[in-house]
A protein has these predicted regions:
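Structured interface patches
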Residues: 1-201
Length: 201
């Protein structure tokens, strides 16, 4: 027969796609179960372990939607879930939070990682209906001028007209976030074709 060791698995989730400086600890989320008891065939294991259930994109958080994670799929090899709890739900408390929509002008867009030898023109004049969530006391005073938009072109290599996702955030407010996806239209040209000079390698 196999001798098992009883241990506690403490759960956590990781929030991805967070803007610079965002305070993840301020998010009002909770797990349906913070921890469960498991048994492990590895007798020298620690009495507790931290287990990441998975990731949640911050842009998908609207304080209403819940996220489900399967417990057994994240346990270590050989560990047995003793509780009968198969799913952990991550939910959010919307009390004290609200959302607003903003229109952000083109001059608040910063381009990063322009491809070598390319010129980039932003065709979009403004980004409408940008949905922002945050604490009510901040949302009551925040304005469109408080937002910065990052257009990161590190994944772009070819010329042409494309729609590209942007990151919207408020540098002065680290507890607000943008819900959903926002895009701008850009035109990418070879410098040689627009300036009649040779492109730089």
């Amino acid at each position: 027969f196999v001798i098992y060791k009883k241990k506690t698995a403490n759960f956590n989730v990781e929030f991805t796609d967070c803007p610079p400086g965002f305070d993840v600890s301020s998010l009002p989320y909770s797990l349906s179960e913070e921890s469960i008891q498991v048994i492990s065939p590895k007798l020298d294991d620690a009495d507790t372990e931290n287990v990441k259930l998975g990731t949640i994109s911050l842009s998908s958080v609207d304080l209403v939607k819940t996220f489900s994670f399967e417990v057994d799929s994240v346990l270590s090899s050989g560990e047995i879930n003793q509780t009968g709890i198969g799913t952990i739900e991550v939910s959010f408390d919307s009390e004290g939070y609200t959302s607003r929509k903003f229109t952000i002008p083109q001059d608040q867009i910063t381009i990063q990682n322009i491809p070598a030898g390319k010129n980039v023109t932003i065709e979009t004049k403004q980004i409408p209906d940008v949905t922002i969530y945050g604490p009510e006391n901040i949302m009551n005073s925040i304005s469109a001028d408080d937002f910065s938009v990052i257009l990161n072109l590190s994944d772009v290599v070819n010329s042409g007209s494309i729609n590209h996702a942007v990151t919207v955030y408020a540098p002065k407010y680290n507890k607000v976030w943008c819900y959903g996806t926002n895009e701008v239209q850009i035109e990418i040209e070879d410098k040689s074709s627009s300036t009649n000079s040779e492109s730089k390698d």
